[in-house]
Each structure stands twice: as C-alpha cells, then as structure tokens.
Amino acid sequence: YEIQKNRVSATGVLAKDDPYILRAAAEAASEIESARIQLIEGISRIHDKIAAGGEPTLQERSNQRRNQVRCAWRAVSALDEIFARSGGGAIRKSSPMQRHWRDAHVGLQHMIHTEGAVFHANSLHNLGLETPQGMIVVV
C-alpha cells in the first residue's frame, strides 16, 4: 500500500482515489492473508501432532503439500493483480515493486512449488488410489 499511496495514473487519478485499484488491492490482501492462514494452520497442525509424539499420515502430508503449493501460487497471483495496476514505473530496476515481483516469480520456479506432481499425488490419495513410489517424494 505504501508504494501505491501517492502514485498518479496516466489519466491523472491518484491511486488512492481509483476504485478499481482499491478493489484489486483489497482482493489481493485478502488472498495473501487467506493463503498465509491456510499455510500456517496446516503446518501448526502437523507440528502439534509430531510434538505430541505422533507421525503425520501420508494423507495429511499430501494435503499439506497441496495447500503449500496452492498458497504460494495464490499469493503470487495476488501480487500480479497489484503489479498490473502499478504503472510503467513499477518495472524499473530502482522500484521495490519490480524486485518483489521478480523474487516471487523466481520462488515459484523452485521444485517445491511445482503443481503437477503434487496435485497429481494428492488427487490419487483423495481418490483412495495407490500413489506410485516415485511420487511419494513430492509429498
């Protein structure tokens, strides 16, 4: 919010007075907060189970991995919605927006955020089907 507060669009409207930018900012904030809550809640649940001497089931691990990946992609999609409304100056190397956008997208390229295998394995679990041994590594 701080970066956008005093920005003026090409049409001369302050970002703080543009209802479309404000709507996108509120929606993005909600998506990021929702992703954060889902991620922390799931990790806390698994942590508590381990702390109590238990071991998470393959299903619990699979669901948490699915949520972890989805949370990352949701948060970056929310960032994209803000970036798309940040004007041409956002892409300048001197802009913190550019750095945040780049870092978020690079983070999604890490193997841990690869959707395909994680979602595939999770769907097999949820359908009660056997997960091939090679896919268990992504869980």
Protein language model features and the residues they cover:
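C-terminal helix-coil-helix/basic helical segment that borders enzyme active sites and/or dimer interfaces
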Residues: 36-69, 83-91
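Extended amphipathic alpha-helical segments enriched in small hydrophobics
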Residues: 1-48
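Generic detector of well-ordered alpha-helical segments enriched in charged/polar residues
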Residues: 22, 43, 47, 58-61, ...
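Glycine-rich phosphate/cofactor-binding loops in nucleotide/flavin-utilizing enzymes
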Residues: 88-139
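A structural signal for alpha-helical segments
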Residues: 13-16, 20-23, 30, 52-66, ...
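Generic structural signal for well-ordered, non-transmembrane alpha-helical segments
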Residues: 26-33, 65, 69-76, 102, ...
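Short segments within alpha-helical structural elements
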Residues: 77-84, 115-119
